[in-house]
Amino acid sequence: MKKLTVNVNPKYDILIEKGLLSMAGELVKTVLTGKKLALISDTNVYPLYGESVKASLEAQGYAVYEYVFRAGEVSKKPQTVLDMVEFMADKGMTRGDGVVALGGGVCGDMAGFAASIFLRGIDFVQIPTTLLSQVDSSVGGKTGVDLPQGKNLCGAFHQPRLVIIDPNVLDTLTDHFFADGMGEVIKYGCIKSSSLFARLENENPKDFIEDLIFESVDTKRIVVENDEKEHGERALLNFGHTCGHAIEKLWNFETVSHGEAVGIGMVMIAKAGENIGITEQGTADRIKTLLEKYSMKTEDIHPVAEIISAMNADKKRTDKGIKFAMISKIGESFIKSVPMEDIPKMFGEIE
């Protein structure tokens, strides 16, 4: 078993091994000591794994109450989280009880947010079931929902007590959803690891999936430990996300997936960096070629002016502009604050 410890307060472990899902109850029991659990999942994941996880939890003596919501970003809104909180209240859950999130990024974000606000905060465990959630969203404590004005504008930092990653669950992912997660993996290569990026260029990621997950999560772990609440270095993890979130908003969080949008955003911001001379020439093309290897989109049909306009609601905006995560070359990243009036010029050569 591969194990990482995230040294925040409270610290927690990330466990990675094929077959861990069958041990869910035993593992959860090590960190959640209450009597009741809300098992939160969606309509895609619960039919696949929900009953077996529920049985595993019940075998440890928990009373388990499953809450299953409609799968997809369309459900990631305040009302869904309020429904979860009311569900937990109806079941008589107390501060000693907990939440188990079984699903992808949307599930983890909402279940974690519900846990953060129910009774002013109860413990929760992440069991991510998509590549995207295993390598990114399940780690770091960011929880929340979308608003009509933009993505992830309502939320809280609430660290899980444990993250259980079973790579076997990725076998049920379609190629599309596997590629969706690759967008975040490629991001880690772009901002921190030229060797990971090169390996993704030259090998099949499914041949080294546990190593891939471990390296991605370890990269995020280090950044989160250094900057838990995103006051500095953690903003590097937003590489491609400012443009990406704007694109998701323009598609009403439906047509273009998060990983696809981030991929497009990485190409856009790398090209913008090349335009103003702070990113090595050819970097955007290299990212584009790697995304295309996984059949991912590399451009959006919306005019750049519309994408820039949609950035106005980005949570990283200040009164002086937007803080962009950028790269000087593959594997080296930095933060650049760009005044709003200079952003169109920076993206000016992107068609």
Residue ranges and their predicted role:
Residues 106-113, 134-135, 245-246:
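Short glycine/serine/threonine-rich phosphate/pyrophosphate-binding segments
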Residues 84, 111-115, 185, 247, ...:
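Buried hydrophobic packing segments
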Residues 198-305:
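Active-site segments that bind and position negatively charged phosphate/pyrophosphate groups
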Residues 1-97:
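ATP/NTP phosphate-donor binding region
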Residues 85-102, 111-126:
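Non-catalytic interfacial helical region
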Residues 17, 39, 128, 166, ...:
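Residue-level signal for inorganic ion chemistry
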Residues 15, 113-203:
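A glycine/threonine-rich phosphate-anchoring loop and its flanking beta-alpha core
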Residues 183-186, 278-351:
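C-terminal charged capping/lid subdomain of soluble metabolic enzymes
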